[in-house]
């Protein structure tokens, strides 16, 4: 880390009380004061959940469409044929194809952020699963990316859909907007995300579901959030 970056980070640390547990409103106000990069930084949330994902009944996975969007331009690809391919093109998909498109992906050509597929073509998609899986691009019914309603899936993807999945340690990370967003927009996005996380609480999860939570920017220190306030969001 360069001296310039170290000095900048040290200055940001002075703006965050490391001993304080912030309310969501306080955290959003504070995180907006931490913008220091030369680009529009992403507001990120990190959660530690009281689940053991090694057990199938404790896997937390899903998606939510953020009210204010993500602030990102999303390239959407769709694997579909015939009428569904036409529907995808009309809905604004950036790439639409089937066998030829899958062959391109198999060669390592991945120039999209979200991949949607119709259920009848998932056998085709399975051939490139080893390439898509590690990149988090594999279509899945739980995130609404395996569907016959391709138009709605495209609308969601371009309109601010965020997918989430707990990792092996019980952590979930997500970008929930840009620091340039208004305080109300960020509050709305974070609340919508947390409500969906709470909705996906496994029945097998006992005790405090959200063990810890923190808010930060792409290049800032983190701000500790009050877990109980988040768990109360329904």
From Swiss-Prot:
Q: Give the record's GO CC terms.
A: cytosolic large ribosomal subunit
Entry keyword Nucleotidyltransferase: no
PROSITE patterns this protein is in?
RIBOSOMAL_L1
One Gene Ontology term from the biological process aspect of the record? translation
Cross-referenced CDD domains: Ribosomal_L1 (cd00403)
Cite the entry's keywords alphabetically. Repressor, Ribonucleoprotein, Ribosomal protein, RNA-binding, rRNA-binding, Translation regulation, tRNA-binding
Q: What does this protein do?
A: Binds directly to 23S rRNA. The L1 stalk is quite mobile in the ribosome, and is involved in E site tRNA release.
Q: What is this protein called?
A: Large ribosomal subunit protein uL1
